[in-house]
């Protein structure tokens, strides 16, 4: 079941693992590119918090004229952004080790697989033009996908993903500063009470996470401190090396799909298609490598880790 946000003014996320029904609010009403997909399986919904730095920014156009649908009424996007909870989450000391030792880790951790498509490969100057994510626990509306309006930044790699300027440079396609609070709400709707999020991406440390961090910073947001970032590429390399120690096998998503005899849904190098495939591949990898949730947590990075590495590489 695919819900187009432009077709509905009210949404509820149904938890099939419990009797509760969490409200989803703040979706962009006129965005025909924004979709929630209904994958019927058990899930647990919860809450998270995020912060937006108090930095004055300006964007092209009038954001106050862009409306978002909220349960009970319609308010400007800027109001939703500015009036979200600003409760600061204090950084956790040695989060990965502390969390990995928690006996109730499965009750705290939500694993979300993600993928991005961009205008080009330069981490600083290019923009995200598509984002997709899926909670591997499944459940109602567990999958998120939208195009993103990059503004004046031209798309130079349309031959890779097939996304053209005329597809994203449209008023109904949300800009990143409008999309971030919506994406945060999606993650919040999947998060377990008082829990943490593990965001998984293939080649995430070198690509997806750097883009995401740069875009959050550009829009004066911070990646929530209770998000952990896991790159699945090292897992793939480790597994493929164990299969053929003397031969360097490809660890690309396509090669892994062939290795596991998995069928792709949709076009290659589109965010949603890659997410659906990576969700299957990731679970296969964790089984083959016999990795527990604790093992995965210890292999995660924080946004501050990746930001520090980016700053170090820039100086070098």
Swiss-Prot record:
CDD domains for this protein: DEDDh
Known role: Exonuclease required for organelle DNA degradation during pollen development. Plays non-essential roles in maternal inheritance. May be part of the DNA salvage machinery.
Domain of life of the organism encoding this protein: Eukaryota
Residues in Exonuclease domain copies: 112-282
EC numbers for this chain: 3.1.11.-
Activity regulation annotation text: Inhibited by free nucleotide diphosphates (NDPs).
Gene3D superfamilies according to UniProt: Ribonuclease H-like superfamily/Ribonuclease H
Note from the entry: DPD1 homologs are present in flowering plants but not in moss, green algae and animals.
Catalytic machinery residues: 269 (proton donor/acceptor)
InterPro entries, per database record: Exonuclease_RNaseT/DNA_pol3, RNaseH-like_sf, RNaseH_sf, TREX1/2
Phenotype reported upon loss of the gene: No visible phenotype.
Keyword Magnesium in record: yes
Effect of residue 123 to W: In dpd1-3; loss of activity
Keywords: Chloroplast, Exonuclease, Hydrolase, Magnesium, Metal-binding, Mitochondrion, Nuclease, Plastid, Transit peptide
Pfam annotation, one family: RNase_T
Any one Gene Ontology cellular component term annotated for this protein: mitochondrion
Cofactor(s) the record lists: Mg(2+)
Binding site for Mg(2+) 2: 115
Recorded family membership: Belongs to the exonuclease superfamily. TREX family.
Binding residue positions for Mg(2+) 1: 115, 117, 274
Keyword rRNA-binding: no
Name this polypeptide is given: Exonuclease DPD1, chloroplastic/mitochondrial
Main location per the UniProt record: plastid
GO MF entries: 3'-5' exonuclease activity; exonuclease activity; metal ion binding; nucleic acid binding
Expression across tissues: Highly expressed in mature pollen grains. Detected in flowers, senescing leaves and roots.
């Amino acid at each position: 079941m695919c819900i187009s946000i432009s077709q509905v003014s009210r949404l509820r996320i149904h938890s099939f693992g419990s009797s509760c029904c969490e409200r989803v609010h703040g979706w962009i009403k006129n965005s025909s590119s924004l979709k929630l997909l209904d994958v019927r399986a058990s899930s647990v919904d919860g809450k998270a918090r995020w912060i937006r730095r108090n930095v004055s920014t300006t964007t092209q156009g009038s954001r106050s004229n862009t409306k978002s649908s909220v349960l009970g009424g319609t308010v400007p996007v800027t109001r939703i952004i500015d009036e979200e909870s600003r409760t600061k989450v204090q950084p956790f000391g040695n989060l990965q080790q502390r969390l990995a030792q928690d006996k109730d880790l499965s009750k705290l951790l939500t694993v979300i697989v993600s993928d991005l498509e961009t205008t080009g490969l330069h981490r600083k100057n290019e923009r995200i033009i598509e984002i997709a994510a899926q909670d591997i626990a499944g459940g109602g509306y567990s999958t998120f996908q939208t195009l993103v309006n990059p503004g004046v930044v031209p798309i130079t790699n349309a031959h890779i993903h097939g996304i053209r300027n005329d597809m994203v440079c449209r008023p109904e396609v949300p800009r990143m500063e409008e999309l971030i609070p919506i994406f945060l709400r999606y993650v919040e709707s999947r998060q377990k009470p008082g829990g943490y999020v593990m965001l998984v991406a293939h080649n995430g440390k070198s690509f997806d996470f750097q883009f995401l961090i740069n875009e959050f910073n550009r829009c004066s947001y911070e990646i929530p401190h209770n998000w952990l970032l896991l790159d699945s590429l090292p897992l793939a390399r480790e597994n493929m090396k164990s299969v053929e120690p003397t031969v360097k096998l490809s660890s690309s998503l396509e090669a892994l799909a062939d290795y596991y005899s998995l069928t792709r849904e949709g076009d290659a190098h589109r965010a949603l298609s890659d997410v659906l495939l990576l969700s299957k591949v990731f679970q296969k990898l964790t089984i083959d490598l016999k990795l527990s949730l604790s093992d995965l947590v210890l292999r995660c990075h924080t946004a501050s880790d990746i930001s520090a590495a980016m700053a170090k590489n820039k100086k070098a």
